[in-house]
């Protein structure tokens, strides 16, 4: 059963405050232990990443990114943490930017998108 709306509202307020400060550690502090991160649309084939994999990358991204097209969050069962974060961004830009970003920060090349049926 989901947490009471008051707990979810408090968590959302903390998330919005972290957004205003644009501080990676403030965001990460709200993530649950089972947190996952997903870039949308799914048709791009980007993998879902767990907290321990995305946290170091997220700290670097926050320093350079200034906006997103859309972001979706899901609360943990207790309502006091963020369980899942999904973001939508400019795919045409990301095709050129991702390899440069991963090379610059030493993450290697980004995962290759899987072919989507009918494409």
From Swiss-Prot:
Official protein name in the record: Ergochrome gene cluster protein CPUR_05426
Taxon lineage: Eukaryota, Fungi, Dikarya, Ascomycota, Pezizomycotina
Superkingdom of origin organism: Eukaryota
Its job: Part of the ergochrome gene cluster responsible for the typical purple-black color of the ergot sclerotia. The ergochrome gene cluster produces several ergot pigments including the yellow ergochrome secalonic acid and its derivatives, as well as the red anthraquinones endocrocin and clavorubin. The pathway begins with the synthesis of atrochrysone thioester by the polyketide synthase (PKS) CPUR_05437. The atrochrysone carboxyl ACP thioesterase CPUR_05436 then breaks the thioester bond and releases the atrochrysone carboxylic acid from CPUR_05437.
Record pathway: Pigment biosynthesis
Induction: Expression correlates with the formation of the sclerotia and thus the pigment production and is directly regulated by the cluster-specific activator CPUR_05433.
